[in-house]
Amino acid sequence: MFSYFRKSQQKVEENQNGGGGDGRGSGIKVELQTNINSRDLKNEHSDPKFKFSPLRSTDVHLEDYDNEKYKLKFIQIVTRHGRRTPESNRTPLTMWMCNSMDHLISNKDSPRPNCNPGQLTVLGIVDQINVGKIYRKLFIDHLGFLDSQYNKDQIFIRSTNTTRTISSARSLMHGLYGGSFTDEQEKSPHHSSFLVKPDNEENMYPRNSKKLVFLKNLIKQHPKVIKENQLSELEKFTEKINKIFENSKPEESSFRARGFRSYAGLVNSFDCFRNNGLPIPKGLTKDIIQRMYEESAKEFKSARYFPEMSILGIGRFVDDLNKELKLKARNDPSVKDLKLSLYSGHDTTLAALLVGYDMYEDKIHPVTSSTLEFLLMQDKDYKEPEVVKITKSIEKELINHQYVKVIYNHKPIHIGPCKDKEVDGMCPLSEFLKISQSIIPTNYDEQSKLTQLDKKRYLSLIED
């Protein structure tokens, strides 16, 4: 049984004066696991000053999910996995602490197994358990939206085919239906009950079709990107970071990324060290780190200059989400009991959705354990027709009384093309479905092809 974590005194407190001070009402109280027993977890590689804490806000506001006018009908949650090890083995992976997949929640491994590249760390597991505990307080204890015991008919779970996303889904579900990280009995559903698509069908993150690869490279030459980078003196900032890596001594930090090709890649590698308690080069100050995250977000956001990047990158997953959402909206018998769908993905999953819907309001790269929620809300005073068969007219009536609210890391965000049509901060479902259609490919295989005419057309766009 794990002895690594004790219950923390850190809580998401109920605030009688309006939650987290933003005037959005009371938050919910959740006891998170944050204290580290340094004797058990830290090793000779760890930063002695490191203290484990959540990487983003855990303050949840009840009125975002249920109020006097609207009720929650269904929710889709898309997550980024928890803290992980680097995907390369340039640094000895013995520096990180991991569990085996067989003993993910309750540690029965003796001796502790070596980590694999890109694997969820012990801290990553705790991250996801904490996310699950927050959702338990919200959906079970406060709203009574989900049954207190796991009901497979109420919850659908899908993960990409990587150990870190599968482990993240299992850990989140353990927090939702289990307890603490020290439980011997894992109470979450086993990963064999998740939907994991074969690699050739996976669409939860951008796949490298010929056209998408071409556009990814071309976007760096887009006049707006070049101008923005010039105004921010990005080249000078990049040189500064490379100089820090050049001057960093091996005994100071094992983290090296000199000559990095993208800020998204840099941030992902950096997170593996800093967020797992390993030392980083001294020259990387808080201001520099903050800008690294901002530059990564700018890279993701640049995809908006070529809408095809969203269509090819995340459009098929948007189609999956929308088909499910529409079935629930029209009360299809196949999803009668379904209340929550969990999709365990990556930073590129979240970033692509945020860009595709023009709702990337945050200034930084999606941190590990981030959550993006699509809430299907319905008018509380609307009485659904009691019919056996849903006709087109009844479907339209149902849809007209439903809305989509989007919440990113427990903060409502807004879909760009829907801002002038919002109702109480939500996008009418009919509008949401229209906007989604603009992101969904009509024929992915054909649209992924890259002809010489395509190349000329795109090159002419950046030359104008």
Swiss-Prot record:
It catalyses: a phosphate monoester + H2O = an alcohol + phosphate. The active site is at 81 (nucleophile), 347 (proton donor). One of its GO terms (molecular function) is acid phosphatase activity. The keyword Hydrolase applies. It comes from the Eukaryota. PANTHER family: 2-PHOSPHOXYLOSE PHOSPHATASE 1 (PTHR11567:SF110), ACID PHOSPHATASE-RELATED (PTHR11567). The lineage of its organism: Eukaryota, Amoebozoa, Evosea, Eumycetozoa, Dictyostelia. Pfam families: His_Phos_2. This is Probable acid phosphatase DDB_G0284753. InterPro entries: Acid_Pase_AS (IPR033379), His_Pase_clade-2 (IPR000560), His_PPase_superfam (IPR029033), Histidine_acid_phosphatase (IPR050645). Belongs to the histidine acid phosphatase family. The keyword Hydrolase applies. Residues 17-26 have a biased composition (Gly residues). Residues 1-29, 180-202 are annotated as: Disordered. Its EC number is 3.1.3.2. It is an enzyme of class 3 (hydrolase). Keywords: Hydrolase.
